[in-house]
């Protein structure tokens, strides 16, 4: 069996070799295996220094104070901690939360849990390009709104929300603003010293770091209070208890440091590859690019091939590892809720493929993907009676199908 070409970088990234080498130094008896909370001896001091350095590295990439970085097990936990933490701490101020229908499941399901606890959540529709209309957000704000949670970059369609304007609007109305930045760190410049953002979630494995590691930015000035969701030894200033995984933290810090040094050059290369991929598909019939192409990260191309089932196409192009939806929900055969929120019908949503490219993608891999996808789409359409009807000029949306 040949190993498929990896083009699913939004699902996860391989750990960078430089990151892995740093992590290994904090695992074995010959390295620095200490507990950073052991402040009475050398091993603990060394681990604590490593954790402090990593905290600084993460803060440097996003232009924040290292004291504002709270370690977590990943962006899912960070989103839970941010949203539940604010809701529970400030529930006497209000019980209304606003979010977007295209958010990651870890935001949407957290909001649904809060609804079961008596909170009210407004789920906003995006525009057809995936972006949020600020007027819609403004109209949804109320006296009892305590939190707005909007992701920076969408995991399926790669669009970049205007978090600067959203944050300003939130702060004008004394509302806390949380941003899920799992898909934007290392791809989009972030300066939290200039943005009106109160909480921001990060994931290491989306940026060539280890899985099971994340962070939450919690603004200190003006101070944001959150109620802990995990209790124990009072680690992370009482916000997230649990022994710190030094090797994981070091890995995340190194991944963020590499991103800070190489992001601009890497984005240029990845954008060129993404554009090459787009050019390879755009002249095909009945091809639709999902999401805004201007306000978008360089490595994402979500594209629908009409009259082809996405699942069938993925099986046909199994020499390329791609996705037809979020990694957390792609086991379902339901059409993507993100694409449905953009207004796509079931057929077009089902025919979508998400190509995401990254640090190790090559021009040869792009060309291979273009040739393979074009050939398989043509073959699958040749087998489709719907394609024949379309080619004969039949408006399939107006066909009344009889049940058998």
From Swiss-Prot:
<dbReference type="GO" id="GO:0051537">
    <property type="term" value="F:2 iron, 2 sulfur cluster binding"/>
</dbReference>
<keyword id="KW-0001">2Fe-2S</keyword>
<dbReference type="InterPro" id="IPR015421">
    <property type="entry name" value="PyrdxlP-dep_Trfase_major"/>
</dbReference>
<dbReference type="GO" id="GO:0031071">
    <property type="term" value="F:cysteine desulfurase activity"/>
</dbReference>
<dbReference type="GO" id="GO:0030170">
    <property type="term" value="F:pyridoxal phosphate binding"/>
</dbReference>
<comment type="function">
    <text>Master enzyme that delivers sulfur to a number of partners involved in Fe-S cluster assembly, tRNA modification or cofactor biosynthesis. Catalyzes the removal of elemental sulfur atoms from cysteine to produce alanine. Functions as a sulfur delivery protein for Fe-S cluster synthesis onto IscU, an Fe-S scaffold assembly protein, as well as other S acceptor proteins.</text>
</comment>
<dbReference type="InterPro" id="IPR015424">
    <property type="entry name" value="PyrdxlP-dep_Trfase"/>
</dbReference>
<dbReference type="InterPro" id="IPR000192">
    <property type="entry name" value="Aminotrans_V_dom"/>
</dbReference>
<feature type="binding site">
    <location>
        <begin position="75"/>
        <end position="76"/>
    </location>
    <ligand>
        <name>pyridoxal 5'-phosphate</name>
    </ligand>
</feature>
<dbReference type="GO" id="GO:0046872">
    <property type="term" value="F:metal ion binding"/>
</dbReference>
<feature type="binding site">
    <location>
        <position position="183"/>
    </location>
    <ligand>
        <name>pyridoxal 5'-phosphate</name>
    </ligand>
</feature>
<keyword id="KW-0963">Cytoplasm</keyword>
<keyword id="KW-0663">Pyridoxal phosphate</keyword>
<keyword id="KW-0408">Iron</keyword>
<dbReference type="Pfam" id="PF00266">
    <property type="entry name" value="Aminotran_5"/>
</dbReference>
<comment type="similarity">
    <text>Belongs to the class-V pyridoxal-phosphate-dependent aminotransferase family. NifS/IscS subfamily.</text>
</comment>
<dbReference type="InterPro" id="IPR016454">
    <property type="entry name" value="Cysteine_dSase"/>
</dbReference>
<feature type="binding site">
    <location>
        <position position="155"/>
    </location>
    <ligand>
        <name>pyridoxal 5'-phosphate</name>
    </ligand>
</feature>
<dbReference type="GO" id="GO:0044571">
    <property type="term" value="P:[2Fe-2S] cluster assembly"/>
</dbReference>
<dbReference type="InterPro" id="IPR010240">
    <property type="entry name" value="Cys_deSase_IscS"/>
</dbReference>
<feature type="binding site">
    <location>
        <begin position="203"/>
        <end position="205"/>
    </location>
    <ligand>
        <name>pyridoxal 5'-phosphate</name>
    </ligand>
</feature>
<keyword id="KW-0411">Iron-sulfur</keyword>
<feature type="active site" description="Cysteine persulfide intermediate">
    <location>
        <position position="328"/>
    </location>
</feature>
<comment type="pathway">
    <text>Cofactor biosynthesis; iron-sulfur cluster biosynthesis.</text>
</comment>
<keyword id="KW-0479">Metal-binding</keyword>
<feature type="modified residue" description="N6-(pyridoxal phosphate)lysine">
    <location>
        <position position="206"/>
    </location>
</feature>
<feature type="binding site">
    <location>
        <position position="243"/>
    </location>
    <ligand>
        <name>pyridoxal 5'-phosphate</name>
    </ligand>
</feature>
<dbReference type="InterPro" id="IPR020578">
    <property type="entry name" value="Aminotrans_V_PyrdxlP_BS"/>
</dbReference>
<protein>
    <recommendedName>
        <fullName>Cysteine desulfurase IscS</fullName>
        <ecNumber>2.8.1.7</ecNumber>
    </recommendedName>
</protein>
<dbReference type="InterPro" id="IPR015422">
    <property type="entry name" value="PyrdxlP-dep_Trfase_small"/>
</dbReference>
<keyword id="KW-0808">Transferase</keyword>
<feature type="binding site" description="via persulfide group">
    <location>
        <position position="328"/>
    </location>
    <ligand>
        <name>[2Fe-2S] cluster</name>
    </ligand>
</feature>
<comment type="subunit">
    <text>Homodimer. Forms a heterotetramer with IscU, interacts with other sulfur acceptors.</text>
</comment>
<dbReference type="GO" id="GO:1990221">
    <property type="term" value="C:L-cysteine desulfurase complex"/>
</dbReference>
